[in-house]
Curated annotation (Swiss-Prot):
This is ATP phosphoribosyltransferase regulatory subunit. Pathway: Amino-acid biosynthesis; L-histidine biosynthesis; L-histidine from 5-phospho-alpha-D-ribose 1-diphosphate: step 1/9. Required for the first step of histidine biosynthesis. May allow the feedback regulation of ATP phosphoribosyltransferase activity by histidine. GO terms for biological process: L-histidine biosynthetic process.
Length: 387
């Protein structure tokens, strides 16, 4: 066996990429802090029952499992940080008002994600707890778009949906868990022939409503207008459309350079989402660069129901798409025993400069740094000169 091989869909992050990832991580977390978000760092391992509380079967399948040698209980290696942050808000912080939290940490997935990305990701996200209003959803969307803009991704396509639409349509229907999962899969793929065949055992009006969802996608105002015509008049459906109208109205007034659309059959994450959902797309990536939405019921599983909304993305993917040049400029210095030189180097480093002292016999080959200046002794002092 080759000792340098890694598991399938697991990869090292090499210096140039790691530099970009870390530069973006710092800048993005500083952005979140400027909005009042507090950084939290949940553990990478938790007891499995806690880790999966309030989530669906998809997360269970994606979670690596192992036995705790101390307690004998099953542990899970987290595949998603969002439920952990919900636990922190509900159980540890226990605040009454609005709480804004952000995070950045590694997650591991047992199965290769859709789109063939790495099974190890650096998940970054922001969550708002304690506000049920549409303004919180819009703040989350705004912060996501600013995140992408900070990474240099200027052309963004934002797709909206709402979990309440299907909840309202299915109210009163006795569908088992397997049937619901099949239905969501058919809606997600917009496979109308199979959906029509699957729905033959349902009431005709319900089958027609489900088929209508697969065609309710496109420009926001057009989709909302058509949805009001073809979907049933139901409190949950009406509220969902009103929520979407609120977000679209706010976006049209204050967001520029973003193409908005609605897809009422896009229900990924349906297991825990409860309201407005959104996905951001950028050129060069067929899958969403980020996903988010409202998930008011997750905290209830930890003993404290709280309105919640937010988003997350993979920072490794974001860095790979970012056009930013994060290559660091550096100063070259000789490796000699000189107190004055050492003091100059220390002063430069304290000011944030990168100073590379060339070791005896070293041939500088690293592409990570661009040495555009060097320290040269002129008379009795060391001077910084351009190379």
């Amino acid at each position: 066996m080759n000792r340098w091989l890694l598991p399938e869909d697991i990869a090292d992050v090499l210096p140039a990429q790691a530099r970009k990832v870390e530069t973006l991580r710092r800048a993005i977390l500083d952005l979140y802090q400027s909005y009042g978000y507090e950084l939290v760092a949940p553990p990478i391992l938790e007891f499995l029952d806690s880790l999966l509380t309030g989530t669906g079967s998809d997360l269970n399948l994606q979670t690596f499992k192992l036995v705790d040698q101390l307690s004998g209980r099953t542990l899970g290696l987290r595949a998603d940080i969002t439920p952990q942050v919900a636990r922190i808000d509900a159980h540890l912080l226990n605040r009454a008002g609005v709480t804004r939290l952000c995070y950045a940490g590694s997650v591991a997935q047992a199965l290769t994600p859709v789109g063939g990305s790495s099974r190890e990701q650096l998940q970054l996200g922001a969550e708002i707890y304690g506000c049920a209003n549409g303004e919180a959803d819009f703040e989350a969307i705004t912060l996501l778009l600013k995140t992408l803009d900070l990474a240099g991704l200027k052309k963004v396509y934002l797709d909206l949906s709402h979990a309440g639409i299907l909840t309202g349509i299915l109210e009163g229907q006795q569908l088992d868990k397997e049937s619901i999962e099949t239905l969501y899969g058919l809606l997600q793929s917009k496979d109308r022939p199979r959906l029509r065949q699957w729905a033959t055992c349902l009431p005709a009006k319900l089958a027609a409503d489900l088929l209508a969802l697969t065609e309710l996608n496109g420009p926001c105002t057009e989709v909302i207008a058509n949805a009001k015509k073809v979907l049933p008049r139901h409190a949950a459906v009406d509220q969902a459309l009103a929520d979407l109208e609120c977000v679209v109205s706010a976006a049209s007034k204050s967001l520029s350079g973003v193409e908005l659309s609605i897809d009422l059959a896009d229900l990924r994450g349906y297991q825990y989402h409860s309201g407005v959902m959104f996905a951001a797309y950028v050129d060069g990536l067929p899958q969403p660069i980020a996903r988010g939405g409202r998930y008011d019921q997750v905290g209830k599983a930890f003993g404290r129901s709280r309105p919640a909304t937010g988003f997350s993305l993979d920072l490794l993917t974001l860095a790979g798409l970012s056009p930013l040049n994060c290559r660091k400029l550096a100063v070259l210095a000789p490796w000699i025993d000189d107190a004055d030189l050492n003091q100059v180097i220390a002063d430069l480093r304290n000011r944030g400069e990168v100073v590379i002292q060339v070791l005896p016999g070293e041939v500088l080959e690293a592409a990570e740094y661009e040495c555009d200046r060097e320290l040269v002794k002129q008379g009795n002092s060391w001077e910084l000169k351009k190379k």
